[in-house]
Curated annotation (Swiss-Prot):
Location of region: Methionine-rich intra-molecular domain: 149-237
Ranges where the record places region MFD domain: 251-323
Bias (Low complexity) ranges: 92-106, 196-224, 311-379, 390-402
Subunit structure: Homodimer. Dimerization may be necessary for its function in neuronal dendritic development. Interacts (via C-terminus) with CREBBP (via N-terminus), EP300 and SMARCA4/BRG1. Interacts with the nBAF complex. Association with CREBBP facilitates transcription while the association with SMARCA4/BRG1 suppresses CREST-mediated transcription in resting neurons.
Signal peptide: none
Compositional bias of kind Polar residues: 117-129
Protein name listed in UniProt: Calcium-responsive transactivator
Organism: Bos taurus
Amino acid sequence: MSVAFASARPRGKGEVTQQTIQKMLDENHHLIQCILDYQSKGKTAECTQYQQILHRNLVYLATIADSNQNMQSLLPAPPTQSMTLGPGGLSQSGSAQGLHSQGSLSDAIGAGLPPSSLMQAQIGNGPNHVSLQQTAQSTLPTTSMSMSGSGHGSGPGYSHSGPASQSVPLQSQGAISNYVSRANINMQSNPVSMMHQQAASSHYSAAQGGSQHYQGQSMAMMGQSGQGGGVMGQRPMAPYRPSQQGSSQQYLGQEEYYGGEQYGHGQAASEPMSQQYYPDGHGDYAYQPASYTDQSYDRSFEDSTQHYYEGGNSQYSQQQTGYQQGTAQQQTYSQQQYPNQQSYPGQQQGYGPAQGAPSQYSSYQQGQGQQYGSYRASQTGPSTQQQRPYGYEQGQYGNYQQ
């Protein structure tokens, strides 16, 4: 019998079916009965032999469970009598008479392992669900994502970065603080590309998508945006954002990320990043909420940003430049795009104060940072947006927020 069982086990390896598993369970059940009989008769040698066979069978089932997550469906299926009991009940029902040890083993092995696999799959799915849930959690961010999707649709540059950021916004927007912290970490890990795209686009999506929700989402998103995009800079930017975090961060954070995100993403990110990279320049910038008035902010930001773009991250500045150029176009386009979105223009109109400020600021920036201003000039909409953030910072943000 033991030989037959032992031989049955290897035969089952090639074909893992419910019949094979059921046969294995029946075999184990019979083995346990034999073991119990021999134990009652005091025949320890036979008990040991059957226990070894049982152990091999259980290990085999465990191996199958590990190798095939579908086994989880297979295991419950064979014991229709114990379907309600599940794999554990299955094993125990299969080996019910004192096979509980086996049942437990089988459960642990058969049921437990597939659940582990499931859990892993669920864990794998979990994050997806998480991001979805996060997305679901923040319907506005979700909407903003949709907005960002459309916005990205409007802004081709953001179309691709938008989708990526949409993924990010899903998460970052969904679990804005948490994920954004993660995203920020990630973004910080990839401050340039990731943040540039994700943060930018997430902020952009936040900005666009959120632009309608703009304050509500931009608050959340700007927490993101500020965090996501600014995260890199947000640490240093935190001072800046905190000043603006109350409101202007939300608006400004996004604004920066919205305009700055696109542009300011280079900027805003650069601003934060520049703050990080240019804590000195952005120390001012960080503290420039006060000195943040257009000139100080613009200077430090431009300087830092210029440094950051040009000097600080030549690659980022180049990337940003390329991105900004693309973005500038996109941002310019986005400016158009935002106007196209009207939500943002409304937002911009909402920003209007900020936008007026941006005009000031952009005039200032353009005047101030010809380089950056010029760049902003192309991205004046975004930079204006950033300028708007600055604007708000100047109280035009208050207007925006109002």
